[in-house]
């Protein structure tokens, strides 16, 4: 039997309703969790694109969030629709300033583990997670670069996506 789904209410979105200036970019911290470390799959609040705050009780004993300090101005979250009634694709880009054996080790884990991501956006946090679909890094989207000249920056650049999701952004 087909499930009836209610469309979200359409409302005014005005910049004067936001108590912040509309600057691009995100905070320098990216928090990562492994989906299998959750005590139970996360569920958005009924009819909304928000999750309850994660606490220690959200995770199995001894598990939790990993914090990555990233390059200032290197993080971005974009989303796009996948067509009528096909949901959205979310993309997360972030840049680590550490290029060494530890960052290569972590990059391998991120490439192969099923993870969720939390990114600071002003006084809110964007949550890139879906209990049914996995965040993926396509070929070539995790790159380490030591640079060639002394003035070059040493970075690990990561760009992955999650699709389909019901909304383009979850908080």
Where in this protein do the model-derived segments appear?
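Short acidic DE-rich linear segments
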Residues: 1-3, 170-171
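Solvent-exposed edge beta-strands and adjacent loop segments
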Residues: 3, 8, 12-93, 135-150
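Hydrophobic side chains in beta-strands
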Residues: 32, 96, 119-121, 162
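Generic "edge-of-domain/loop-turn" microfeature
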Residues: 38-39, 99-101, 124-126, 165-167
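Oligomerization/assembly interface segments of phage tail-like spikes and tubes
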Residues: 79-101, 151-166
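Short, conserved charged micro-motifs
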Residues: 101-108, 169-170
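Short, acidic/charged, Gly/Pro-enriched secondary-structure junctions
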Residues: 105-131
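Mixed-charge, glycine-accented linear interaction segment located at domain edges/termini
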Residues: 131-171
């Amino acid at each position: 039997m087909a499930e009836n789904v209610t469309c979200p209410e359409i409302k005014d979105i005005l910049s004067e309703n936001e108590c912040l200036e509309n600057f691009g970019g995100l905070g320098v911290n990216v928090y990562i969790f492994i989906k299998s470390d959750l005590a139970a799959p996360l569920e958005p609040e009924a009819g909304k694109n928000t999750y309850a705050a994660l606490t220690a009780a959200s995770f199995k004993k001894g598990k939790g969030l990993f914090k990555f300090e990233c390059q200032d101005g290197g993080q971005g979250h974009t989303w796009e629709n996948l067509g009528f009634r096909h949901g959205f694709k979310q993309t997360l880009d972030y840049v680590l300033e550490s290029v060494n054996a530890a960052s290569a080790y972590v990059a391998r884990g991120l490439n192969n583990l099923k993870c969720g991501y939390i990114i600071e956006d002003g006084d809110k946090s964007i949550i890139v997670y879906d209990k049914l679909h996995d965040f993926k890094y396509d070929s070539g989207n995790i790159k380490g670069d030591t640079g060639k000249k002394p003035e070059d920056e040493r970075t690990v650049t990561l760009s992955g996506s999650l699709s389909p999701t019901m909304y383009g952004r979850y908080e």
